[in-house]
Amino acid sequence: MGKNNSKLAPEELEDLVQNTEFSEQELKQWYKGFLKDCPSGILNLEEFQQLYIKFFPYGDASKFAQHAFRTFDKNGDGTIDFREFICALSVTSRGSFEQKLNWAFEMYDLDGDGRITRLEMLEIIEAIYKMVGTVIMMRMNQDGLTPQQRVDKIFKKMDQDKDDQITLEEFKEAAKSDPSIVLLLQCDMQK
């Protein structure tokens, strides 16, 4: 998709205008920046992790970046092209609450089976704790919960049928009925 081209092809640009929340001008700017950072037109996992490390210098962002990468890489080819990047960015930055919930669920559902287990949830929550670093986490995590305690609290609120897994429907219903759950999922990063 437009690899090594300095401009998006008109049909690609039109497609992205239709399928993202970005304007034509914004897409052109994002594409220019993407090519500056990724001259090959694609990001591999290592490059993606380096971007996260720049944004989270006080912790270890590598594990969380690995999960985000998996969620961005829609076709599963081990790289992120501009389309995958901008579509994910559109959802996470400007998408509807529903779109963001779907994206978050996809990230937490590590094996893609449509259910989040306690272990999957714990892996993501631990990755978030490591990413932001100890000092920042202590400031953000005013309730003092460990990753395991946070998972237990989330499951108590979300796992309606008490089968130790969360379906997309349970995930959405709980998040809509109790917005504080979304903060738990983010480890209160929005405070």
Swiss-Prot record:
Lipidation (N-myristoyl glycine): 2
GO biological process, any: response to heat
SUPFAM superfamilies: EF-hand
Tissues/organs with expression: Neuron-specific in the central and peripheral nervous system.
Record keywords: Calcium, Lipoprotein, Metal-binding, Myristate, Repeat
One Pfam assignment: EF-hand_1
Ligand binding (Ca(2+) 2): 109, 111, 113, 115, 120
GO molecular function: calcium channel regulator activity; calcium ion binding; protein domain specific binding
Boundaries of every EF-hand domain copy: 24-59, 60-95, 96-131, 146-181
Binding site for Ca(2+) 1: 73, 75, 77, 79, 84
Note from the entry: Probably binds two or three calcium ions.
Function: May be involved in the calcium-dependent regulation of rhodopsin phosphorylation.
Family listed: Belongs to the recoverin family.
Name of the protein: Hippocalcin-like protein 4
Species name: Rattus norvegicus
Lineage: Eukaryota, Metazoa, Chordata, Craniata, Vertebrata
